[in-house]
Design a protein with these regions (language model features):
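Acidic, serine/threonine- and glycine-rich low-complexity intrinsically disordered segments
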Residues: 115, 121-232
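Bacterial Sec-dependent N-terminal signal peptides
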Residues: 1-24
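Aromatic-residue detector
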Residues: 2-5, 34-36, 137-144
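Acidic, serine/threonine-rich low-complexity disordered tracts
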Residues: 20-105, 179-295
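Mixed-charge, low-complexity intrinsically disordered regions
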Residues: 105-106, 115
C-alpha cells in the first residue's frame, strides 16, 4: 500500500513538472538598460584561452510589432598569447564597440538587425586591418590561406542570418519568445556549424537544456567539405573525391554536446547563464565554457 502511495505521489510530481510551462517574455519598455559580464574559456589545439567582456542591452524604441534593443559589447580581455588567442582577439575586435540594433517582437525574440548594412560595413573594414595583423604576426597562416580566403572566413560568420542564429543559440536573448515545458525540444546551429537538437527541463524560473548533434550523413558531409574548403582549400578536392571513404574511416567524424543553464530574474531577463560545450570535428577537440552574469 505504501509503495502504491509513493508511486502515485511520484507520478503526480512528474506530471506537475511536465505540465509547467515557462513563457519567456522579459519586461521591455523604452529606456530599459541591462548590463552583463561574460567569461568564456576555450580549450583547443593544446591551448587554454579565457575571454572576458561586458555587454549592454538598451531598449531604444517601441514599435507596433515589438521593440528595438541596442546591444553593444566592450572591455574585451584575452589572457593568452598563442594562435587560438590571436584568432579569438580578431573575432572579438570585429564586433567590439559596434552597436547592434535588434528588431524584436513583443516577447523580445530577435527577428532582424535594423542597422545590418552599417554593421556589415564596419566589420568588413575591421576585417581587413585584423587580417593584415594576423598575417604579419603569424606568417604560417598565410602559407595555408590567402588574405581573401581569410576575409571570406571572417565575413561568412557575419551574415545577418548567421548573427541571428548565433543569438538564438545561446545568450541573453536566446530564450525570448519561447514557451518552454520540460521535455520540449527545438533545433539550432551551434558555433561549430553543427545542427543540434535541444531538450529542455524547467524548474520554476530555471531552465536547463541539453543538446546533441542532429545531422544526417549528407549534412555531415556537406559541413566537413565546407570546413575543409575554409581551412585547407588545397585539399578540398581530394576530400570531395574521397568523402565516403574518409567518413567510414572515422577521420572526419563530427561529434558534439552542449549543456546550458539559465536562471531568469522576476522581470524575465536572464539573471545568470552557464554553458558547457564539447565538440570533436576532424579529430580536433574543442571545449568551451561560458558564464554570463547580470550586473
Amino acid at each position: 500500500m505504501k509503495k502504491m502511495i509513493l508511486m502515485s505521489t511520484l507520478l503526480l510530481m512528474t506530471c506537475l513538472v511536465q505540465a509547467q510551462i515557462l513563457n519567456v517574455s522579459p519586461t521591455l519598455k523604452k529606456g530599459n538598460v541591462m548590463t552583463y559580464k561574460s567569461t568564456t574559456n576555450v580549450k583547443a589545439s593544446g591551448t587554454d584561452v579565457t575571454v572576458t567582456e561586458n555587454s549592454k542591452y538598451t531598449v531604444t524604441e517601441e514599435t507596433k510589432d515589438g521593440f528595438v534593443i541596442d546591444m553593444i559589447s566592450s572591455d574585451w580581455n584575452v589572457n593568452s598569447d598563442n594562435m587560438v588567442s590571436h584568432l579569438l582577439v580578431a573575432a572579438t575586435e570585429m564586433v567590439s564597440g559596434i552597436n547592434f540594433r535588434f528588431i524584436t517582437d513583443k516577447s523580445g525574440q530577435v527577428k532582424s538587425i535594423k542597422n545590418y548594412d552599417e554593421v556589415k560595413a564596419k566589420m568588413a573594414e575591421r576585417a581587413d586591418k585584423l587580417i593584415e595583423g594576423i598575417l604579419k604576426d603569424m606568417p604560417e597562416v598565410g602559407q595555408v590561406l590567402s588574405k581573401d580566403q581569410l576575409k571570406e572566413q571572417f565575413m561568412g560568420a557575419t551574415t545577418e542570418e548567421a548573427l541571428i542564429k548565433s543569438i538564438k543559440a545561446n545568450g541573453v536573448l536566446a530564450l525570448n519568445g519561447k514557451a518552454i515545458a520540460s521535455g520540449a525540444q527545438d533545433e539550432y546551429v551551434n558555433s561549430q556549424g553543427m545542427k543540434m537538437k535541444r531538450f529542455f527541463l524547467v524548474n520554476g524560473k530555471k531552465v536547463t537544456s541539453t543538446s546533441t548533434v542532429n545531422m544526417t550523413q549528407d549534412d555531415m558531409k556537406k559541413m566537413i567539405i565546407e570546413k575543409v574548403e575554409q581551412i585547407a582549400p588545397a585539399q578540398a578536392q581530394m576530400v570531395k573525391d574521397n568523402i565516403d571513404t574518409l567518413m567510414e574511416s572515422g577521420l572526419l567524424k563530427a561529434e558534439g554536446t552542449e549543456k546550458s543553464s539559465y536562471e531568469l530574474a522576476d522581470d524575465g531577463w536572464v539573471k545568470t547563464m552557464t554553458m558547457e560545450s564539447n565538440s570533436k570535428v576532424m579529430q580536433q577537440e574543442t571545449s568551451t565554457t561560458q558564464t554570463i552574469t547580470r550586473q
